[in-house]
């Protein structure tokens, strides 16, 4: 191929991610032209409604997928946590890139630690997964929906609308915004379990051999192992991107540490488990853990969670 067209959202973070992949492809394939095609998704346009209430899968991916299926673009760069586990016919996950920090973080102008937040503090997040885990730790908090790009969220924090907001450490690091905020508290995995695929970039592409061959070098073995477990877990539970599911797999040497949680958005009921396993079990352990959760009532919890959202 002489040219690859990348479908990308227009947010600053999405453009950073796409520029990063563009540079890697150009470095790998000398002389290849790589073009970014910016577009808005449903999730970018509807900003006055919590994501869970908009409904449907692929809120941040469908328009990009449509452009690939029409042949207007060849690949799309996504935050893997936004990518549904089932792909439209003709598309597939071509590569999973090395992961950034997978953890969630609390950003605040006044409070250095999560435990410093006063009773009834206002915390901004749209994620039901984050809301659930915040309320499990601190039922007194007032969790307020917060939509928009990272800059919009930071502006609202600085204007005093919130005592704290929750962001992914990956986005904080990629946009290099640590100097812009007073306090960053990073949650441990025992406090807040991330979303499937958090911190990884996923390359979606048309299911054509030439495109897949040109992008295969982007795959990172460790990221593939970890996110396979996480995506298998969510796939078996039949959970979308907007339901309260946390799953984190972390590979160190030949050992994988896994933490998972499923529950109601208000934190009143949840199922949580942790385990360690060997690297060679990565293709089965996510599914097995999901079936254990199902035996404990996870699917019923998720149905109730969708009704509450």
Swiss-Prot record:
Sorted alphabetically, the Gene Ontology BP terms of this entry are: protoporphyrinogen IX biosynthetic process
Q: Which residues form a coiled coil?
A: none
Name the Enzyme Commission number(s) assigned to this protein. Answer: 2.5.1.61
Provide any one GO MF term from the record: hydroxymethylbilane synthase activity
Q: Does the keyword S-adenosyl-L-methionine apply?
A: no
Report keywords, A-Z: Porphyrin biosynthesis, Transferase
Which catalytic reaction applies to this protein?
Answer: 4 porphobilinogen + H2O = hydroxymethylbilane + 4 NH4(+)
On this chain, the residues bearing S-(dipyrrolylmethanemethyl)cysteine are 241
**EC category name:** transferase
Query: Pathway involvement?
Result: Porphyrin-containing compound metabolism; protoporphyrin-IX biosynthesis; coproporphyrinogen-III from 5-aminolevulinate: step 2/4
Decide whether keyword Transferase is in the record.
yes
Query: Which InterPro entries does its entry note?
Result: HemC, Porphobilin_deaminase_cofac_BS, Porphobilin_deaminase_N, Porphobilinogen_deaminase_C, Porphobilinogen_deaminase_C_sf
Q: Please list the cofactors this protein needs.
A: dipyrromethane
- Entry GO CC: cytoplasm
Q: How is the cofactor bound?
A: Binds 1 dipyrromethane group covalently.
PANTHER family registered for this protein in UniProt? PORPHOBILINOGEN DEAMINASE (PTHR11557:SF0)
Describe its function. Tetrapolymerization of the monopyrrole PBG into the hydroxymethylbilane pre-uroporphyrinogen in several discrete steps.
This chain belongs to the protein called: Porphobilinogen deaminase
Top-level taxonomy = Bacteria, Pseudomonadati, Campylobacterota, Epsilonproteobacteria, Campylobacterales
Which gene specifies this protein's sequence?
hemC
């Amino acid at each position: 191929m002489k040219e690859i067209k990348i479908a990308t959202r227009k947010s600053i973070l999405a453009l950073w991610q796409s520029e990063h992949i563009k540079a890697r492809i150009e470095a790998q394939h000398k002389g290849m032209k790589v073009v970014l095609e910016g577009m808005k998704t449903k999730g970018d346009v509807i900003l006055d409604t919590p994501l869970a209430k908009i409904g449907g899968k692929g809120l941040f991916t469908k328009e990009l997928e449509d452009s690939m299926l029409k042949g207007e673009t060849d690949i799309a760069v996504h935050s893997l946590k936004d990518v549904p586990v089932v792909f439209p016919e003709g598309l597939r996950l071509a590569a999973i890139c090395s992961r950034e920090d997978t953890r969630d973080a609390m950003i605040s102008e006044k409070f250095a630690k999560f435990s410093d937040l006063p009773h009834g503090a206002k915390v901004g997040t749209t994620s039901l997964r984050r809301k659930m885990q915040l309320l499990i730790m601190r039922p007194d908090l007032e969790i307020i929906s917060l939509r928009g790009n990272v800059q919009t969220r930071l502006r609202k924090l600085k204007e005093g609308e919130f005592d704290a907001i929750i962001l992914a450490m990956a986005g904080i690091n990629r946009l290099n915004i640590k100097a812009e905020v007073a306090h960053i508290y990073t949650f441990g995995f025992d406090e807040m379990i991330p979303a499937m695929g958090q911190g990884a970039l996923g390359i979606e592409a048309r299911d054509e051999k030439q495109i897949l061959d040109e992008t295969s070098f982007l795959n990172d073995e460790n990221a593939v192992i970890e996110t396979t477990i996480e995506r298998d877990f969510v796939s078996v539970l039949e959970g979308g991107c907007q339901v309260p599911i946390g799953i984190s797999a972390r590979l160190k040497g030949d050992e994988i540490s896994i933490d998972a949680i499923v529950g109601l958005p208000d934190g009143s009921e949840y199922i949580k488990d942790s385990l360690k396993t060997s690297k060679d079990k990565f293709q089965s352990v996510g599914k097995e853990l999901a079936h254990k959760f199902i035996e404990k009532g996870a699917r019923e919890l998720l149905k109730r969670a969708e009704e509450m959202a």
